[in-house]
Amino acid sequence: MRHRHGLRKLNRTSSHRLAMLRNMSNSLIEHEVIKTTLPKAKELRKVVEPLITLGKKPSLANRRLAFNRLRDRDSVAKLFDVLGPRFANRPGGYLRILKFGFRVGDNAPMALVELLDRPEVEETENVQEAE
């Protein structure tokens, strides 16, 4: 029986799955939006949301826990210096998963994973280049 079984296997060994979710977490924290398959996106939510909750309480112990899970100093710094204060008043639900059609090669369902409350990117550079 699969009662209370935590994560999807995603057809990978445990070490591959851990490395993949760690890399995807780092990419999401760095770029704030990534495109991936829908099952991976749903698993990524289970990994990243507790990390952002850690980032809301800046202590040395929480930084060490986050580094243990991410293994990237730049991601940990952004997590505690940028994302933690940004989501300080939000009690959870820091990610949005948008269905994004199907992949051309194998028809896998794709999704966009993005952090909420992203700062808007100004289009002034593109407007100046067009003129």
From Swiss-Prot:
Family annotation (PROSITE patterns): RIBOSOMAL_L17 (PS01167)
GO biological process, one term: translation
GO molecular-function terms, A-Z: structural constituent of ribosome
Keywords tagged on the record: Ribonucleoprotein, Ribosomal protein
InterPro entries for this protein: Ribosomal_bL17, Ribosomal_bL17_CS, Ribosomal_bL17_sf
GO CC terms in record: cytosolic large ribosomal subunit
Quaternary state and interactors: Part of the 50S ribosomal subunit. Contacts protein L32.
Family membership noted in the UniProt record: Belongs to the bacterial ribosomal protein bL17 family.
HAMAP family in the cross-refs: Ribosomal_bL17 (MF_01368)
Protein's name in the database: Large ribosomal subunit protein bL17
UniProt source species: Burkholderia mallei (strain ATCC 23344)
Gene name in the database record: rplQ
